[in-house]
């Protein structure tokens, strides 16, 4: 997908992206800007820890070649290769807490993968407490374009946050979204779950699947996370020659709880897998 199309898609997605959630702290600083508290270090210096030869171009974009080697957040069987070259105007920046410590995350959408229908997007974790250091980097792309997704981060306790990202693409009347819920343990990203939803805009109806997140602090050491997909259908306003769809809405919820035995979050049901399978029949 070329840069113009990515920009148009970004504008269309603003209602559900972190750019609208100022209270949650997502920002898009120019990479040449100095870090707060580190006037001799820029965001470009952080980005070069991921793409070593990244440099500013004459068109307002930053370009480079291959990033460092990294794993995919879903595991070794997921993801494609990074593009041989990439160019972007900025990166999304989000402050989080993990293990009671302040950390910085940056999300770089590098563009299309040469051997996969998915893109390649780097989620990087930095320690800025002393000399800035890259702690971890993962590919979080499961579709063509990737972003932080509102609410961007979720509090799992007094000193820990989870991060929410999304990957998506659209055609003329369908939208495909993969939402990643990610925590950080021992300064390493760990996937909690990947949730796939599907929107459809036909003449006779518009069907959307929107996500909401809620945490409960009664579980230790991490809060329980309840994710709800609201699957809603609204009748179309035009006469399509077909029977009008009835308005409907129902919620599908899954709760994730920390399991001390396996040291990870465990989902309470397979409802989202069943939703994904049902959606696939409508592609």
Where are these regions (language model features)?
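Bacterial N-terminal signal peptides that target proteins for export
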Residues: 1-9
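A glycine-rich, hydrophobic loop/mini-helix early in the fold
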Residues: 102-156
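Repeat-based blade/solenoid architectures
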Residues: 70-90, 140-151, 200-207, 278-279
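Eukaryote-skewed repeat-based solenoidal scaffolds used as protein-protein interaction platforms
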Residues: 138-187, 193-198
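Structural signature of eukaryotic scaffold interfaces centered on beta-propeller domains
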Residues: 89-100, 149-159, 212-219
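Short beta-strand elements that form the blades of beta-propeller/WD-repeat-like
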Residues: 102-110, 160-168, 221-229
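Bacterial N-terminal signal peptides
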Residues: 8-18
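Acidic, small-residue rich beta-repeat scaffolds with periodic aromatic anchors
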Residues: 22-75, 171, 176-283
């Amino acid at each position: 997908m070329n840069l113009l199309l990515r920009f148009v898609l970004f504008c269309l997605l603003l209602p559900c992206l972190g750019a609208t959630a100022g209270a949650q702290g997502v920002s898009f600083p120019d990479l040449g800007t100095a870090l707060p508290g580190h006037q001799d270090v820029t965001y470009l210096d952080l980005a070069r820890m991921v793409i070593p030869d990244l440099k500013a171009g004459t068109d307002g974009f930053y370009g480079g070649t291959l990033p460092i080697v990294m794993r995919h957040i879903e595991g070794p069987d997921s993801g494609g290769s990074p593009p041989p070259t990439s160019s972007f105007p900025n990166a999304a920046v989000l402050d989080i807490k993990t293990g009671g410590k302040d950390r910085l995350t940056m999300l770089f959408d590098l563009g299309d993968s040469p051997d996969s229908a998915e893109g390649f997007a780097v989620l990087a974790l930095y320690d800025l407490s002393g000399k800035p250091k890259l702690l971890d980097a993962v590919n979080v792309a499961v579709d063509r374009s990737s972003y932080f997704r509102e609410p961007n981060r979720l509090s799992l306790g007094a000193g820990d946050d989870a991060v929410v990202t999304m990957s998506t693409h659209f055609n003329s009347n369908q939208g495909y979204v993969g939402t990643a819920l990610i925590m950080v343990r021992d300064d390493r990203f760990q996937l909690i779950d990947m949730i796939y939803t599907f929107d459809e805009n036909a003449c006779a109806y518009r069907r959307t699947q929107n996500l909401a997140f809620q945490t409960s602090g009664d579980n230790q050491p991490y809060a329980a996370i309840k994710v709800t997909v609201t699957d809603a259908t609204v009748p179309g306003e035009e006469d399509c020659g077909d029977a009008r769809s009835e308005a409907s809405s129902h919620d599908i919820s899954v709760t994730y709880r920390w399991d001390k035995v396996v040291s990870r979050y465990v989902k309470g049901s397979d409802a989202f897998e069943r939703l994904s399978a049902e959606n696939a029949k409508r592609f």
